């Protein structure tokens, strides 16, 4: 869960609680598919906990809370249909193979020589 060789131990009790909360949320995050509302909400909550400035934390929490109140429990596992613009989403890192219209397909031509 927490590796003392890789990470420093938090200096305050609040820092320790935040570290445990983030580790727990990362485990919960693994139970959701990356293209669901629940996954996005958990990522938002992790960003709320990681914010250092009180103003930034308040702004992120207000955004998170408004999204959470607007969602029913059944919607958390449903795929998102709206597109978001954040670069850290796994669904933005997928490469889509698209067939280009201007490139003709190659066809196999049978041998037409007669013996």
Swiss-Prot record:
Where this protein primarily resides, as one coarse class? Answer: host cell
Q: Does the keyword Plastid apply?
A: no
* InterPro entries in the cross-refs: Gemini_V2, WCCH
Name the GO cellular-component terms.
Answer: host cell perinuclear region of cytoplasm
Q: Where in the cell is it found?
A: Host cytoplasm, Host perinuclear region
* Self-association and partners: Interacts with host SGS3.
What is this protein identified as? Protein V2
- Record the organism: Tomato yellow leaf curl China virus (TYLCCNV)
């Amino acid at each position: 869960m927490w590796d003392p060789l890789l990470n420093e131990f938090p200096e305050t009790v609040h820092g320790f609680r935040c570290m445990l909360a983030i580790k727990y949320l990362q485990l919960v995050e693994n139970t959701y598919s990356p293209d669901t509302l629940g996954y996005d909400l958990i990522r938002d909550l992790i960003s709320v906990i990681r914010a250092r400035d009180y103003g930034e934390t308040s702004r992120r929490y207000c955004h998170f809370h408004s999204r959470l109140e607007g969602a029913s429990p059944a919607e958390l596992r449903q795929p998102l249909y709206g597109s978001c613009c954040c670069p850290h989403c796994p669904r933005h890192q997928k490469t889509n193979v698209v067939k280009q219209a201007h490139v003709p397909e190659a066809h196999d031509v049978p041998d037409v020589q007669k013996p």
